[in-house]
Amino acid sequence: MTIKNKFKEELESIHKSLIEVSDWMYENPELGFEEYKTSEYLVNFIKSFHDNVIFPTGDLETAFEITFGKEGPLVVLGVEYDALPEIGHACGHNVIATASIGAGIALRNLVDELGVRVKLLGTPAEEGGGGKIILLDKGAFEDAKCSMMIHPGPLNVANPTFTTIQQYKVEFFGKDAHAAGAPEKGRNALDAQIQLFVNASTYRQQMVQSNRMHGVIKDGGFKPNIIPSYTSSEWYLRSLNKDCLLYTSPSPRDALE
């Protein structure tokens, strides 16, 4: 039997269990750096096949790792499992985690024959928390020849387009006042925030086609009859590479500045 067929046979034997893992994660979402139940659940699932799991790891309470094999180039399979506020696993981290764990478990008895090592690396807080960056700084990717994971989407794509992303928080500070009794004494921080969104909309017409810019108002005030003295928004700026993001004219960052 070929290695590929052996892998498929291993995967088929755990297919039902993997679906159960994905469904459990979907029904039990946890935010970044707070994935206590999820990380424990995943670690226990992996331990049912191999008990050599390091948990926690990388100075992160909800990170874990396990390496199959002792010799050969190291392949890291990323396991993401944090969810989004309000909308849970809308980004499909339950699928990402299940796919990587399934691949790692199915390969555990084949690594020597393949001549590789395979590491399952649980990476918390990928929705803005930078869990992989922290683990990278702690040496979790040291000696890795490559790092892989899948991401759910409407199409199967083996070589997708990747983008650079920068995240910004934009704050405006004004002066509060009663909007009906003494509006002339206020300095409306929400007006400034709205103007920023107008600027961003006009900039989109001239931006390089591959650039993307999207934001939301996180704090816009608390009562209609109070002129807001403080507002904040969060933005994601994306492009095909760093130079295109920062140095094209106009760039997404120009709209914010």
Question: Model segments located where?
Answer:
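Histidine/acidic-residue-rich, glycine-tolerant segments that coordinate divalent metal ions
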Residues: 62-65, 82-90, 94-95, 101, ...
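Short loop segments at secondary-structure junctions
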Residues: 69-72, 175, 241
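Solvent-exposed, non-transmembrane alpha-helical starts
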Residues: 240, 244-246
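Acidic/His- and Gly-rich active-site-bordering loop/insert found
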Residues: 3-115
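Active-site catalytic microenvironments for nucleophilic, acid-base chemistry
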Residues: 106-110, 199, 251
